[in-house]
A protein has these predicted regions:
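Long, positively charged amphipathic alpha-helical accessory segments at protein N-termini or as interdomain linkers
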Residues: 2-12, 27, 53, 106-135, ...
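N-terminal lobe of the biotin/lipoate ligase/transferase fold
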Residues: 1-130
Length: 297
């Protein structure tokens, strides 16, 4: 079943029932929940998972419990959204789509999951016009449109006995007010001593007139399918599709440790290959930023 609650100041006709009907044949216990406000959808699902784990420990005599069921949690407004490396994600009702998908997952290799998620999102939002891909993917977790950030992905996991529960957070700009970005960019400059990023873009630059509900219906069910495909097949099923949208391939990049080089695509498990003066390096965890000379952060 599905639930939806909408604030009076920003009513949205969320397609919760349609998404549930599309997904439940594969995940019978799947639910969709929409909250008017939360600090972070990822934080909320991680809290629920920890609380359920503690409850299970207190009832250990009853046997080994199952991990929490699959859920899609949507927030109309996040007041403490999080991105990779603890970065803030600003979210206002109607301006952004913010949601998290949580489900038990047991892939043979977790490497490349965020890239697979990005592939699914980009393919779901790409206009079917037979043209070259418009939406690009910046390793490891950003969606780009016109070399500006459209959205981001945050993947977190929690242990549940011998199982793991994954929480996949997604934030997409539907329409981003300039004043929101200006404040965030100013704060970023004060906090990091780095130049402020370029202004983000939004889905309305690609699909004029769309709203967050439209975007959710476009991406939700295909994302669930992609995650299940990743569980069975790993990153191999997504590698070529990622390469077709790789925003960094052939570009000069700078790593957070100061190393500079040219991005040369991703490996079999999603690591970024960078050709440096000391040879080819495989990067799996360091933050990557495009050189300032490329005019993109």
């Amino acid at each position: 079943m599905s639930t939806a609650t909408h604030p009076l100041h920003a009513p949205v006709r969320w397609p919760a029932e349609a998404i549930w009907q599309a997904v439940v044949p594969q995940l019978p216990s799947f639910t969709v929940e929409v909250l008017p406000q939360v600090d972070s959808t990822n934080s909320e699902l991680m809290r629920r998972c920890r609380a359920a784990s503690l409850a299970a420990l207190s009832n250990a005599a009853l046997g080994s419990p199952e991990a929490p069921e699959a859920i899609l949690l949507v927030a109309e407004h996040q007041n403490a959204g999080r991105g990779r490396l603890g970065r803030q994600w600003q979210s206002q009702a109607g301006a952004s789509l913010t949601f998290s998908l949580g489900l038990p997952l047991q892939p043979a290799n977790w490497s490349g999951l965020s890239l697979a998620v990005g592939v699914s999102l980009a393919e779901s939002l790409e206009p079917a016009n037979g043209q070259a891909p418009t939406l690009q993917l910046k390793w490891p977790n950003d969606l780009w449109l016109g070399q500006r950030k459209l959205g981001g992905i945050l993947v977190e996991t929690a242990n549940w006995g011998d199982q793991r529960y994954v929480v996949i957070g997604v934030g997409l700009n539907v329409t981003q007010p300039n004043e929101d970005f200006s404040a965030a960019a100013s704060q970023s400059t004060r906090d990091t001593q780095t130049p402020p990023p370029m202004a983000p873009t939004s889905l309305q630059a690609l699909w004029p007139g769309v709203d967050a509900a439209w975007a959710l219906q476009a991406v939700a069910a295909p994302l669930v399918q992609a995650v299940l495909d990743f569980e069975r097949e790993g990153f191999a099923a997504f590698r070529a599709r990622f390469a077709a949208r790789d925003a960094l391939a052939g570009r000069r990049v700078k790593l957070s440790n100061g190393t500079e080089g040219t991005a040369c695509g991703v490996g079999a498990h999603g690591a970024l290959s960078v050709q440096t003066q000391n040879g080819l390096q495989e990067i799996s965890s360091l933050e990557v930023s495009v050189r300032p000379a490329d005019h993109v952060q």
